[in-house]
Amino acid sequence: MAEENQEETLELKPSRKPPHFVLIHGMSLGSWCWYKIKCLMEVSGFTVTCIDLKSSGIDSSSVDSLTTFDQYNQPLIDFLSSFPEQEQVILVGHSAGGLSLTSAIQRFPKKICLAVFIGASMLKNGLQTDEDMKDGVPDLSEHGDVYELGFGLGPENPPTSAIIKPEYRRKLLYHMSPQQECSLAALMMRPAPILALTTAKLEEEEKEKGQEEQVPRVYIKTLLDRVMKPEQQDAMIRRWPPSQVYELESDHSPFFSNPFVLFGLLIKAAVSVGSI
């Protein structure tokens, strides 16, 4: 387990091209949530891309227009589709962003040298079964009615969007994070396309069958997480064992509550596959 909460900077070897990190946010967040990690990476000489998925961050899509996971995940797919064939990225996903990582691994295994899941849904086939839902979807029912739901297709149909109510956010998402980060999130969070997320039934591309297991995966456990509970993380790790498991003492939002140690673990993961 990482012990020290210190800023790290690295001097890259001149002959080696710095790794390209691609950071994927979770439900209701956006590329903005990575601003501390992005800064630490860039001052250390790394290339970083933070992507807004559909209806997230500054993406202008209507949340109620998204009914499939592929629609929601399209910005990541577009990015990887246009990425040079001879180059690779390190994908990093938080929370529901893990579903985006798995989809990308299935479609572009040769363009990904490492996938890092941070307190994230790590399910080989997405949300196919009741067991997948139990392990990979947060169950916050013990806290009461915590979600604001939107019914863009009418009240007779399943909800199209969801966001945690303001009064529950600090308790569930940010209980170890500085107050200013909670204030930032209050300004920036948007309803998530819950209908699209629950359709994330993932299958390998026929031409890439068998390739996904060649992509190394690292799981970073968020040990004090009140959303993706540690027992859920353990269950997903048992079912689809990653190459390595790291532990981080943080809430559900380590990019706010423990950014320096999180940065160090991401660098450690990159070193483990020879990217640095």
Swiss-Prot record:
Tissue specificity: Expressed in several tissues of seedlings and adult plants, with a higher relative level of expression in the seedling shoot apex and the adult stem.
Residues in AB hydrolase-1 domain copies: 19-138
Coiled-coil portions: none
Main EC class the enzyme belongs to: hydrolase
Leader peptide range in chain numbering: none
Keyword Protease (UniProt): no
Active site: 95, 225, 252
Any one GO molecular function term: methyl indole-3-acetate esterase activity
Catalysed reaction equations from the record: methyl (indol-3-yl)acetate + H2O = (indol-3-yl)acetate + methanol + H(+)
Knocked-out gene: effects: Longer hypocotyls when grown in presence of exogenous MeIAA.
Keywords carried by this UniProt record: Hydrolase
GO biological process, one term: indoleacetic acid conjugate metabolic process
Pathway per the UniProt entry: Plant hormone biosynthesis
InterPro entries hit by this protein: AB_hydrolase_1, AB_hydrolase_fold, MES/HNL
EC number(s) on file: 3.1.1.-
Family stated for the protein in its record: Belongs to the AB hydrolase superfamily. Methylesterase family.
Role description: Methylesterase that efficiently and specifically hydrolyzes methyl indole-3-acetic acid (MeIAA) to IAA (auxin). MeIAA is believed to be an inactive form of auxin that needs to be demethylated to exert a biological effect.
Protein's UniProt name: Methylesterase 17
Gene that this sequence comes from: MES17
